[in-house]
Amino acid sequence: MVIQRKYRASRRLGVSLWGRSKDPFNTRNYPPGQHGNMGYKKPSDFGKQFGAHKKFKFYYAISSKQMRNMFLKAYKKKGDTGDNFVGLLESMLSSVLYNSGLVPTIFSARQLISHKHVLVNGKVVNISSYSVKPGDTIKLREKAVNLPSVLAAIDAQEQKVPDYLEVDVKERSVKYLRVPKYYEVPYPANMEVNLVIEFYSR
């Protein structure tokens, strides 16, 4: 199953990245390919930085190139680089949709977007990395509101909706209120943005 293969990232990194009950890490908290729980090797400083980079990359389901471009953009902006970086990541259309709890995974969010099932202020947007602005309203199109994955996500309520989003479950919509700071994002895992900054600053 595609989602299960993607969840292998949790086992590779030694954390439950998305905090989901179906995450294989919950029952097999050791690296994939390893027979039995022999634990994880203690990483070097570079290993810690690289691991932090990987956690963000997999959590948001983006490429290394996208990650680097976002970091460079965050670095050039005024203010705290870590907050800027996370703010850009959380402003992606796929992130807002996933954090709304209207979809079960970041992967399903990206799929709905690419299949043109998502509206931003009434217009179809099919780019997952589209930057949502404060005040924008994201809504599922009519043909997607009762998809099994959407109904299952709403029923499960596994996603903690952050304060910077306003969700209307009945309307299958979410309003992006503001760009969050790093500390405001309810990551299920320990996401060390300082190590990502160190990784890109080498």
UniProtKB/Swiss-Prot annotation:
The keyword Chaperone does not apply. Disulfide bonds: none annotated. Keywords: Ribonucleoprotein, Ribosomal protein, RNA-binding, rRNA-binding. It holds the Pfam family Ribosomal_S4. One of its GO terms (biological process) is translation. One of its GO terms (molecular function) is structural constituent of ribosome. Residues 91-154 form the S4 RNA-binding domain. PROSITE patterns: S4. One of its GO terms (cellular component) is small ribosomal subunit. NCBIfam families: PRK05327.1, rpsD_bact. One of the primary rRNA binding proteins, it binds directly to 16S rRNA where it nucleates assembly of the body of the 30S subunit. With S5 and S12 plays an important role in translational accuracy. PANTHER family: 30S 40S RIBOSOMAL PROTEIN, SMALL RIBOSOMAL SUBUNIT PROTEIN US4M. Part of the 30S ribosomal subunit. Contacts protein S5. The interaction surface between S4 and S5 is involved in control of translational fidelity. Belongs to the universal ribosomal protein uS4 family. This is Small ribosomal subunit protein uS4. The lineage of its organism: Bacteria, Pseudomonadati, Pseudomonadota, Alphaproteobacteria, Rickettsiales.
